[in-house]
Amino acid sequence: FIMMKSLIITLLCSFCLSTTNAQSYFRQCGIQLLTKQNGLSNNTLTGIYQDKAGFLWLGTDVGLSRYDGIHFHNYNLIDKEPRALTHLYETSNNLLWSHIANLNQIACFDKMRGIYMPLISPTPEVLQDIQDICVLQDKLYALTSNAIVELNMEKNADEIRLTAQPLID
């Protein structure tokens, strides 16, 4: 037991020293570490995207964070259940799309209004089984467990209607 305790203490001390050395090295190289202490919503990043205006959009497990080079503005998801927002993409209508990896769903954020948009579909089962997403030439594509689909968007004031058109079954 004493050997195990000594090993754990040694590993913890080594980790703390290496973290301190890493932070010092980053500062010397002009690299700024950004964390919750700087305003980031969560230290766990699951996606990153830079938009045309230069803002960095960071996916975390509590929502999106927008970084302007100085400040963070956080857009937390409504429910408090952890979600990994990955694969961030933007379409020309200022919508930021993200895959919610741990739920196999997608999220849509309206950058102009600063809100998450509800997604409505006549085939909701398609929206419950998304493995990955991609935006190509302003079109949203999704990979499900048994098909590749193009998701056609119709944006209303309060919601986005999605219809799925299978490309490959």
Locate predicted features.
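Carboxylate-rich, polar loop motifs that coordinate divalent cations or form catalytic acidic clusters
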Residues: 2-169
